[in-house]
Amino acid sequence: MCAAQRSAAALAAAAPRTVYAFSARPLAGGEPFNLSSLRGKVLLIENVASLUGTTVRDYTQMNDLQRRLGPRGLVVLGFPCNQFGHQENAKNEEILNCLKYVRPGGGFEPNFMLFEKCEVNGEKAHPLFAFLREVLPTPSDDATALMTDPKFITWSPVCRNDVSWNFEKFLVGPDGVPVRRYSRRFLTIDIEPDIETLLSQGASA
């Protein structure tokens, strides 16, 4: 366990094991948004980038899930991050136009909440992602997923539970507890059965 992991573990042990302890500033600006306001919702959290090879696929699938399952209690949350191949190098105020006119383009507008750019690995990692990585150290579909190309590692320290690329996914249950982590190779749309299971649990609670 690296020093950052030990620190995160100590923090996690001292705090509730839910995402409700965290907040983030919306991409549109304004006051920090408290995730505690989403109690009872199923959350799908992804680190996103507007210039990635899977931007079109993942953004449109995130929109699709939010459109169809949002009325039943799903909330999709996107966190732009520039740590992987510098593929989110736009300023916060430029990201929506990049999505609208470049990728996915064609007037695309996300129907889910986007937050300001943040880091997900290293000393400056957003506390939410430090927490998610500690609770779910590896993707369930690929426990060996790692960033293996040194030229793309721009953060320090490097930890075994680091996010390895854009569009890793974290699924959180209606009680705020992280349930499952998926690699970048796992299609966003294929998380739907797991989301359905959690939505059913929430409805019967």
Curated annotation (Swiss-Prot):
- Catalyzed reactions per annotation: 2 glutathione + H2O2 = glutathione disulfide + 2 H2O; a hydroperoxy polyunsaturated fatty acid + 2 glutathione = a hydroxy polyunsaturated fatty acid + glutathione disulfide + H2O; tert-butyl hydroperoxide + 2 glutathione = tert-butanol + glutathione disulfide + H2O; cumene hydroperoxide + 2 glutathione = 2-phenylpropan-2-ol + glutathione disulfide + H2O
The biological process GO terms on file are:
angiogenesis involved in wound healing; arachidonate metabolic process; biological process involved in interaction with symbiont; blood vessel endothelial cell migration; cell redox homeostasis; cellular response to oxidative stress; endothelial cell development; epigenetic regulation of gene expression
Modified sites of kind Phosphoserine: 37, 200, 204
How does it associate, per the subunit comment? Homotetramer. Interacts with MIEN1.
EC primary class: oxidoreductase
Pfam families per the record? Answer: GSHPx (PF00255)
Key word Lipid metabolism present in the record? yes
Q: Does Mitochondrion show up as a keyword for this record?
A: yes
Annotated site (Not glycated)? 41, 91, 100, 124, 151, 169
SUPFAM superfamilies from the xrefs?
A: Thioredoxin-like (SSF52833)
Cellular compartment(s): Cytoplasm; Mitochondrion
Q: Which family does it belong to?
A: Belongs to the glutathione peroxidase family.
**Residue positions of the PTM N6-succinyllysine?**
91, 117, 151
GO molecular-function annotation terms? glutathione peroxidase activity; phospholipid-hydroperoxide glutathione peroxidase activity; protein tyrosine kinase binding; SH3 domain binding
Q: What is the stated purpose of this protein? A: Catalyzes the reduction of hydroperoxides in a glutathione-dependent manner thus regulating cellular redox homeostasis. Can reduce small soluble hydroperoxides such as H2O2, cumene hydroperoxide and tert-butyl hydroperoxide, as well as several fatty acid-derived hydroperoxides. In platelets catalyzes the reduction of 12-hydroperoxyeicosatetraenoic acid, the primary product of the arachidonate 12-lipoxygenase pathway.
Protein name per its UniProtKB record: Glutathione peroxidase 1
* Protein EC: 1.11.1.9, 1.11.1.12
Q: Name one GO cellular component term.
A: mitochondrion
Keywords, in A-Z order: Acetylation, Cytoplasm, Glycation, Glycoprotein, Lipid metabolism, Mitochondrion, Oxidoreductase, Peroxidase, Phosphoprotein, Selenocysteine
PTM info:
During periods of oxidative stress, Sec-52 may react with a superoxide radical, irreversibly lose hydroselenide and be converted to dehydroalanine.
Q: Which gene encodes it?
A: GPX1
